[in-house]
A protein has these predicted regions:
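Conserved hydrophobic/aromatic pocket- or pore-lining residues that grip, position, or stack substrates
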Residues: 124, 179, 189
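Short glycine/serine/threonine/alanine-rich loop segments
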Residues: 8-9, 184, 342
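Short beta-strand segments at enzyme active-site cores
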Residues: 10-15, 186-188, 267-271
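Alpha-amylase-like alpha-glycosidases and glucanotransferases acting on alpha-linked glucans and related
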Residues: 23-169, 193-487, 495-497
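Gly/Pro-rich turn-and-neighbor structural signature
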Residues: 172-173, 186-191, 196
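Catalytic domains of carbohydrate-active enzymes, especially glycoside hydrolases
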Residues: 1-19, 263-264
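Active-site pocket-lining segments that scaffold enzyme catalytic pockets across diverse folds
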Residues: 168-181, 185
Length: 497
């Protein structure tokens, strides 16, 4: 309602797929490509058949979200435990009390309609609880058929998990319909990969290459992390066996998109570059510390000659780039065909090959425009009025700090140099030692970034040579929203800066 009243056209969310039992799970490490996370279920009694309001007076505890917030704001394990306790009680009422007997057939019919993914998921959850981990390669039984036979002895627990998924879909579909009625599109997020510790990989292992872990090559934006600066980002996701997926016309991907668009009106594809080629590591993230100090030769010795590289082929030769372009075009067309007419956005940040963005525009998939990353060869910033219409303008994604933080960090570097008399009237002084050289270099970097921002939104020096304030905030976001991009967005925390 707030979004609609503020005339916001869409609300983008991070992935909402099931997260498993980890205390600090990432929404990009879901244990299923389809199943939804029950942590987000509403506990309004009218939204959960079987839930009785009196149960809230019987817990004896203050709900976790009503407790004083600590530095992490939400105690997710506590919220999960509290919600599951209440939902189990509701499930008991739902299946035993006669007033819910008329709804039970609808639930059973829904279960029948889901196909294999739901049974795989509920079995996987039972096995995770039984063996104490989602790391299935540590289980005493790793054969899918035999593991499923073990899970068959826990039908009641499986049924509870099925019911939770039914509730999740019903609630999300209600929200999606309501949002559509208020002219607000809910934007989902499809991660480029699935967790190695997922029901998909365990039960459909033939679709995944688990010998390699997907990630991204080393590049300057994450230089503060020594492993990322040296080797790149190792996300630990298995690679797709696209040739195997092609044998059933990419049914796994079609199913994934179909279920996403049941609850979202549009969606973002995370790290869309990997549809063309993906940077892969021959070791899991748990081994990053082992490989960090090694040379490439030493690393190759440990892996039998394998080193991080683009897969299925490199990206340097013309023939490689042509084939990568053809692959990406094919795979993205099949994704789009799974939900015709649904708007799609592609997160195309990082080391972007020059053939990717033209192809995305050809497919009508807007890519990202991060203003302070859009710099001309002469060093000036590209203005919003120069953006291609098929683009998505934003000052950052969930991986970024807020714009206020970026601005204040940059200005603080200038102020530090100024207080040390190393920066006078916008001009740096000549350093006399390495420490001063470092301080001046940081101030120059900060001034360059703020000047880009100022040029982007037309601010004068007397306005932008300052810490973040309402005038700067207004100018920055006004310029963003006036860009030629099809979409423009701000991070939710930025509303409160």
């Amino acid at each position: 309602d707030w979004t609609a009243d503020a005339h916001v056209g869409f609300l983008q969310l991070l992935p909402v797929n099931a997260l498993g039992r980890d205390e600090c799970p990432s929404p990009y490490s879901a244990i299923s490509s389809i199943a939804l996370e029950p942590l987000y279920l509403s506990l309004e009694p009218w939204t959960v058949p079987g839930l009785e309001e009196r149960v809230f007076n019987e817990t004896g505890d203050t709900p976790p979200w009503e407790q004083p917030s600590g530095p992490d704001l939400v105690d997710y394990p506590k919220v999960r435990s509290w919600k599951m306790w209440i939902l189990r009680g509701a499930w008991h009422n739902f299946r035993t009390k006669p007033e819910y007997a008329g709804i039970m057939p609808k639930f059973r019919e829904w279960v029948k309609e889901q196909g294999s993914w739901l049974e795989d998921f509920v079995c996987f959850q039972v096995l995770c609880d039984l063996f104490g981990t989602a790391i299935w390669w540590h289980w005493p039984e790793q054969d899918p058929a035999r593991a499923k036979a073990i899970a068959a002895d826990y039908e009641e627990e499986k049924d509870f998990s099925r019911w939770l998924q039914w509730l999740c879909e019903k609630q999300w579909e209600f929200i999606r319909i309501y949002a559509d009625e208020r002219n607000v599109k809910l934007m989902g997020d499809i991660p480029i990969g699935v967790s190695l510790s997922s029901s998909d990989v365990f039960f459909e292992r033939h679709l995944f290459n688990t010998d390699w872990c997907g990630g991204a090559p080393a590049e300057g934006n994450y230089a503060a992390d020594p492993f990322t600066a040296k080797w790149g980002q190792n996300w630990g996701i298995p690679l797709y066996k696209w040739d195997v997926m092609a044998q059933d016309n990419f049914a796994w991907w079609r199913r994934r998109v179909k279920y996403c668009t049941k609850i979202f009106s549009m969606y973002r594809i995370d790290h869309i570059l990997d549809f063309y080629r993906i940077y892969a590591f021959p070791w899991k993230p748990t081994e990053n510390d082992v490989f960090l100090p090694l040379t490439r030769e030493q690393a190759a010795e440990r892996t039998g000659g394998r080193l991080p590289a683009f897969k299925p082929r490199g990206d340097d030769q013309v023939w490689e780039r042509n084939m990568n372009l053809a692959d990406g075009d094919l795979y993205l067309r099949l994704v789009l065909s799974a939900a015709p007419g649904v708007s799609v956005v592609g997160e195309d940040l990082g080391c972007v090959p020059d053939y990717v963005r033209p192809n995305m525009r050809q497919l009508d998939i807007p890519g990202f425009k991060i203003p302070h990353w859009e710099i001309k060869p002469d060093g000036s910033i590209i203005l919003g009025k120069e953006y291609h219409e098929c683009s998505f303008a934003a000052f950052g994604t969930h991986d970024f700090e807020t714009l206020m933080q970026t601005w204040n960090d940059s200005y603080a570097k200038i102020e530090r140099a100024r207080k040390l008399n190393l920066w006078m009237g916008g001009v740096p002084k000549t350093p006399s030692n390495p420490e001063q050289e470092h301080i001046i270099k940081e101030a120059e970097d900060g001034a360059r970034l703020l000047k880009w921002f100022a040029d982007y939104c037309g601010m004068q020096p007397e306005t932008w040579m300052s810490y973040w304030n309402l005038e700067i905030k207004t100018a920055m976001y006004r310029a963003l929203f006036r860009s030629k991009s099809r979409y423009s967005a701000i991070l939710w925390p930025a509303l409160f800066d």
